[in-house]
């Protein structure tokens, strides 16, 4: 329902006219001093006429009255008598204002506004008066108060309310950047069915968008649409920008679509915004279509920004052909390529592994422009790092300085990461020291070095770096201390780890869940369950919520210290109290814990509970179960698990195949083991060293050294290194086969690749040589053991003692017996049998009896 007030119909757009002879307000009158007998000039100035018969003759006394006698009512009477002559009314207002003072608080000002907006000749003056009033008032008057004054003065003095007065008031607020008041004015105008001028509304919408009051801008527009006011292209543009700022490109396109349905003709700016919206939705077909449409309609050549948007989207979608075509099209239109588009193209080339094209474009940028910026260098340096081309990365890093670009923390960190990954530790530390000295390294870079130092076991150097950071004003954060604390825990130095934890508290930093997880895990790794649980108590007493990471650490730790039942109980409590979103990781720890404790039935029960709780087992779950079942001679169940994995679409990985193959090899079922090995290869998996070792051991146990050696050769061909276990198994089998030459060659090869013989391989060789009567070589091995500080075990001593017995060297045999005792190695029954039989056979019953 429309307001009872009558509003004058006015054009939706106007051109404000400048005030002629516009002078600023001042404290002195701009008119001649009044006299007892006003001159013709005074009458003309005040009344607009020299006639004594002026319609307001009754008010002539006003000119000669004392200032204090000039009240608002008298001024209003004169103004009302000049309502048909707005310019005369304004002259009188300006004349009376110095005598009376400010009229803005009363009705005088608003009566004048109504008079001025009634004539096109004084529109501009009305607007200027309102602008001055709003901008000079302190505090800024409330919009609702001024609207009320407009409406009330119209009713009181018989004016038809002109919507122009409201719009000029809106203009005054929007020009003074009083956006909230401007919004209030629009809302009140809409309530009064007054149609706002769109240039003024657009200015208000623009202010709302600029300050990110996007929802408020949309709501204001919606209220206008509700009364049938749609706005113009500028309005549509502002609303599209609001949607794009909110990352709602589909909404922006919908705004444009509705505008077109209402008959709007999109201009070049709306096309550009539509292209940007399509790029954000990666609808490149539509974006390219809009570009063509812009050209066909000859609105304008797409701008650099528009072309850049489509190029960026094409690169993001991996469509480099389109991106390059658009770049060429842009250049042919006479539009230069900016650094954003050029850098995006370099990024695309790098992603396509086309480094040549990337560097060609970079060289062109250096020669012809646009000049590469820091982001351009970042893309290339990061690409070089990922591909291990660190010398090239360093070259571009130095080139930045030549071009006057200051490397950032990102560049330093990227190169340091690359050096560390490539095991170029000295280069990494050198660059770090340089950046640290120049102040370029921040806590982020320092934390990377701290982490690396601690992984290398260099916790002393890490601790020293913490001190240097503080002295340089680089405050270590919780991550810094976490790195050092983790380093101490890895070295099982829990006392130092606790000192670091205390430092965190002393520095006023707040330990996070990861901090506590490090300490808890460190305690469990040291089999210190009590202190681990004390750390948990410290968390709860400090009102720190224990999250899933910490709970998982506790469960995993309990399983490691043989408290798997307690871990399962904790898990059950957490599920009941809904304190943890249980994953298969928790159950995996429990299943593995039960297996290591020999509780296979409990492990299977935990698996069944896991499935009952709706948690899907993963490959780790199945591998743990199959490994345990195989080691407990339950191959049928292990194969059932394998079949279940396949039925559920869980692919076997190398550890899973390894568990089954090892199980079959230990049972000498080499046919099944070989079948699984073939299946593994068909799946495209690469066998691991443990799998090869299991197969070699299996064939060795069957005496099939040909097959064992074939696997050894394949292992080397696949690029895998043999470990001590591999060589021990092969040498043992070859010695049993009597192939001493090949066994000796493998032993030499083993030492050549840097493997140091241990007690086990010495035992195998000594026993093998002893059984073949190679006593001289046995003694040689025995001496080599001592030289390498490997203590012979009782089996080796027995073999050497037996050899001396067979050689008739009983004194040396007894000396070795005494040596065993001196080294704390207890002789076994075989030792005594050798020595006793030797004494009796040599008619030394007394010595034999003493044994």
UniProtKB/Swiss-Prot annotation:
Name the domain of life.
Answer: Eukaryota
Instruction: List the subcellular locations.
Output: Mitochondrion
Q: List, alphabetically, the SUPFAM superfamilies matched.
A: HCP-like, TPR-like
Q: Which GO terms describe its cellular component?
A: mitochondrion
Q: Which InterPro entries match?
A: Pentatricopeptide_rpt, TPR-like_helical_dom_sf
PROSITE patterns hit by this protein: PPR
Transit peptide, UniProt annotation = 1-26
Output the Pfam families linked to this UniProt entry.
Answer: PPR, PPR_1, PPR_2
Keywords tagged on the record: Mitochondrion, Repeat, Transit peptide
Query: Repeat PPR: residue ranges?
Result: 162-196, 197-231, 232-266, 267-301, 303-337, 338-372, 373-407, 408-438, 442-476, 477-511, 512-546, 547-577, 583-617, 618-652, 653-687, 688-722, 723-757, 758-792, 793-827
Similarity comment: family membership: Belongs to the PPR family. P subfamily.
What is this protein called in UniProt?
Answer: Pentatricopeptide repeat-containing protein At3g54980, mitochondrial
In its UniProt entry, the species of origin is given as Arabidopsis thaliana (Mouse-ear cress)
Q: What is the lineage of its organism?
A: Eukaryota, Viridiplantae, Streptophyta, Embryophyta, Tracheophyta
């Amino acid at each position: 329902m429309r307001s009872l007030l009558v509003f004058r119909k006015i054009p939706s757009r106007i051109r404000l006219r400048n005030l002629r002879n516009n002078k600023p307000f001042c404290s002195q009158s701009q008119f001649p001093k009044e006299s007892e007998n006003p001159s013709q000039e005074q009458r003309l100035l005040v009344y607009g006429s020299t006639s004594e018969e002026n319609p307001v003759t009754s008010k002539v006394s006003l000119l000669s009255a004392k200032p204090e006698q000039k009240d608002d009512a008298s001024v209003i009477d004169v103004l009302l008598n000049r309502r048909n002559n707005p310019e005369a009314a304004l002259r009188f207002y300006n004349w009376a204002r110095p005598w009376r003072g400010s009229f803005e608080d009363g009705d005088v000002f608003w009566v004048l506004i109504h008079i001025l907006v009634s004539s096109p000749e004084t529109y501009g003056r009305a607007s200027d008066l309102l602008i001055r009033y709003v901008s000079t008032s302190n505090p800024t008057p409330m919009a609702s108060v001024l609207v009320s004054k407009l409406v009330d003065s119209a009713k009181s003095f018989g004016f038809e309310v002109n919507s122009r007065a409201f719009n000029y008031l809106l203009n005054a607020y929007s020009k003074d950047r009083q956006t909230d008041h401007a919004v209030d004015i629009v809302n009140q105008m809409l309530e009064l069915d007054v149609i706002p001028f769109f240039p003024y509304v657009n200015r208000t919408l623009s202010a709302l968008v600029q300050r990110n009051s996007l929802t408020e801008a949309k709501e204001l527009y919606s209220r206008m649409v509700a009364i049938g006011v749609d706005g113009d292209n500028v309005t549509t543009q502002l609303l599209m920008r609001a949607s794009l700022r909110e990352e709602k490109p589909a909404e922006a396109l919908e705004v444009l679509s509705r505008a077109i349905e209402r008959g709007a003709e999109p201009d070049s700016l709306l096309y550009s915004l539509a292209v940007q919206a399509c790029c954000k939705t990666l609808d490149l077909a539509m974006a390219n279509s809009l570009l063509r449409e812009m050209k066909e309609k000859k609105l304008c050549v797409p701008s650099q920004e528009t072309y850049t948007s489509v190029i960026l989207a094409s690169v993001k979608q991996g469509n480099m052909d389109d991106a390059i075509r658009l770049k060429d099209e842009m250049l042919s239109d006479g539009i230069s390529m900016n650094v954003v588009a050029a850098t995006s193209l370099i990024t695309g080339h790098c992603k396509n592994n086309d480094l040549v094209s990337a560097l060609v474009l970079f060289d062109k940028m250096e020669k012809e422009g646009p000049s590469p910026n820091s982001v351009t260098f970042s893309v290339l340096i990061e690409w070089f790092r990922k591909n291990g081309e660190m010398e090239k990365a360093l070259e571009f890093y130095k080139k930045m300085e030549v071009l006057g670009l200051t490397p950032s923390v990102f560049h330093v960190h990227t190169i340091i990461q690359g050096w560390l990954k490539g095991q170029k530790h000295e280069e990494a530390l050198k660059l770090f020291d340089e950046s640290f000295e120049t102040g370029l390294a921040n806590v982020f870079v320092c934390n990377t070095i701290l982490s690396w130092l601690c992984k290398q076991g260099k916790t002393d150097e890490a601790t020293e770096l913490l001190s240097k950071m503080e002295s340089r004003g680089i405050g270590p954060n919780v991550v810094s201390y976490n790195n050092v604390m983790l380093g101490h825990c890895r070295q099982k130095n829990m006392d130092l780890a606790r000192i670091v934890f205390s430092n965190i508290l002393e520095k006023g930093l707040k330990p996070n869940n990861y901090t506590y997880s490090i300490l808890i895990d460190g305690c469990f790794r040291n089999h210190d369950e009590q202190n681990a649980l004390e750390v948990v108590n410290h968390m709860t007493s400090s009102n720190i919520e224990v999250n899933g990471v910490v709970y998982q650490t506790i469960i995993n730790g309990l399983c490691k210290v043989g408290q798997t039942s307690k871990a399962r109980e904790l898990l059950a409590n957490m599920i009941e109290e809904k304190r943890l979103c249980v994953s298969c990781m928790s159950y995996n720890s429990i299943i593995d814990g039960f297996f290591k404790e020999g509780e296979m039935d409990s492990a299977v029960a935990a698996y069944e509970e896991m499935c009952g709780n709706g948690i899907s087992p993963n490959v780790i779950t199945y591998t743990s179960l199959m490994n345990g079942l195989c080691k407990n001679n339950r191959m049928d169940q292990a194969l059932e698990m394998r079949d279940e994995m396949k039925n559920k679409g869980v692919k076997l990985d190398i550890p899973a195949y390894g568990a089954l193959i090892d199980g079959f090899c230990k049972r000498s079922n080499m046919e099944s083991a070989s079948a699984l090995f073939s299946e593994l290869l068909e799946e495209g998996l690469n066998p691991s060293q443990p799998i090869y070792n299991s197969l070699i051991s299996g064939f060795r146990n069957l005496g099939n050294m040909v097959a064992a050696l074939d696997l050894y050769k394949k292992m080397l061909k696949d690029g895998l290194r043999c470990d001590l276990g591999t060589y021990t198994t092969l040498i043992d089998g070859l010695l049993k086969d009597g192939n001493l030459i090949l066994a000796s060659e493998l032993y030499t090869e083993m030492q050549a690749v840097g493997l140091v013989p241990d007690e086990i391989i010495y035992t195998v060789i000594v026993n093998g040589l002893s059984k073949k009567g190679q006593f001289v070589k046995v003694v040689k091995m025995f001496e080599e053991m001592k030289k390498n500080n490997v203590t012979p075990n009782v089996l080796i001593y027995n073999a050497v003692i037996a050899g001396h017995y067979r050689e008739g060297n009983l004194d040396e045999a007894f000396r070795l017996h005494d040596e065993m005792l001196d080294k704390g190695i207890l002789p076994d029954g075989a030792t005594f049998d050798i020595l006793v039989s030797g004494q009796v056979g040599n008619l030394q019953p007394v010595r034999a009896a003493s044994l």
